Amino acid sequence: MEILNNWISGINDILWSYVLIIMLLGCAFRFTFKTRFVQFRMFREMIRVLGDSANKAHEGEKHISSFQAFAVSLASRVGTGNLAGVATAVAVGGPGAVFWMWIIALLGSASAFVESTLAQLYKRKGKESFIGGPAYYMRYGLGLNWMGILFAILISVTFGFAFNSVQSNTICAAMQGSFGFDPRIVGAVLTVLTLAIIFGGIQRIAKVSSVIVPVMALGYVALASGIVLFNITELPAVIKLIVSSAFGWEQAAGGTIGAALMQGIKRGLFSNEAGMGSAPNVAATASVTHPVKQGLIQTLGVFTDTLLICTCTAFIILFSGAPLDGSVNGVQLTQHALTLEVGKAGGIFVAVAIFLFAFSSIIGNYYYGEANIRFITPKKSVLYIYRLLVGGMVMFGALASLELAWSLADITMAFMTICNLVAISLLSKQAFLLLHDYIVQKRSGIKSPVFDKNKLPELKDKAECW
């Protein structure tokens, strides 16, 4: 097991130290400038379209609304990356890692806009709802079926297996730390609950996510806000520490700026998924009047995840004065920090929050896998086998080591992200055209723009569902 972990860590170091940092930041900067900072100038419009109901004029009653698509994607985003991932980033990369998480969210949200807009453009009609995602725009946009199948395999393994093992591992660690529960029992219960929901299909997943996600996010933000207000006099010092740790001379001399940068980008991507190619799978299912609407919705999801919830975790840890020497790591660091702030109840709260956050992620992660298994083959038997394997990986995660679980997630996430970034870079001009069309309609006085493919000849043959 140690040999496997060392081999995987070696590959991860190459991918995350060079390849992905260049690609993620390069795409993020390009999309930010090409869209003229869409993630900032259209923030009010993001809030407005969040309340749009499903467009049922032609598609029927089963398609999900913008908010439900937002909730399912946020269910995947808001998970252990927000509590355990941020803690790991701060423990390994120092407080400066938080700064780089902010940067990758602010810039990377433009990548989220492009990928989700493209997913809407290339979506297809399924039996229950629309279907789509990177595999579809690789097949129908680039004409590269092999690339679509490769991505579908990567995301099915990454989210259904690797990420879900991380979520399960973190839940078990939190429950064992707070209540002394046996990981085997917790893992068995998680497996049963997971299988019960994922055999219910996207409609059940959407309904469960739209209830769990707002409740858990608001509860966690409320607690963190209380801690920030209680320590308000220390807030300037904490922010100064974050920024100085990202650029300071001491960090440069010690070589930790690179660690902060790498951890910030790695854990930031694991948490907000901007440019990874995951959120477009659920963005495509939404029934909207214009592809840009889901691009805006998923951009808002990145902000909610990183700038709000991840920041809450970082502040809780830094306010508490918990040791960042590696003696406490992962979710245990977050639990320890909250215990220092509000007493034993804090650790219990984190255990409950982790269960809700991570379990909702397991549900959302599974959907990404299912959507891509359907892309590879229509056989129901394959889908049923995949569901059972997902359940098996949830149980595996409960028993595996934390280090191996994270390493597997990092390497599969890296390969699928590279695949997706190449695709959206090649197709990005189409997203820019759609954004221009949307803005022109808004400026002409149309409150809720409607996409008419006949007005954009360049996209007419691409938009089957429009």
Regions found by a protein language model. Name each.
Residues 4, 34-39, 81-86, 95, ...:
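Transmembrane helix-loop junctions in multi-pass membrane proteins
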Residues 9-48, 91-128, 304-310, 411-421:
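Extracellular loop-to-transmembrane helix junctions
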Residues 23-30, 34-47, 169-175, 181-230, ...:
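Membrane-interface loop-to-helix entry segments
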Residues 1-80, 91-96, 426-466:
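N-terminal alpha-helical transmembrane segments of multi-pass membrane transport
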Residues 37-64, 88-98, 102, 110-142, ...:
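Flexible loop linkers connecting adjacent transmembrane helices
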Residues 27-32, 104-128, 134-135, 139-169, ...:
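Helix-loop-helix module between adjacent transmembrane segments
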Residues 57-92, 118-121, 127-135, 139, ...:
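Alpha-helical membrane segments and immediately flanking helix-loop junctions
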Residues 113-122, 127, 223-241, 249, ...:
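Extracellular/periplasmic helix-exit of transmembrane alpha-helices
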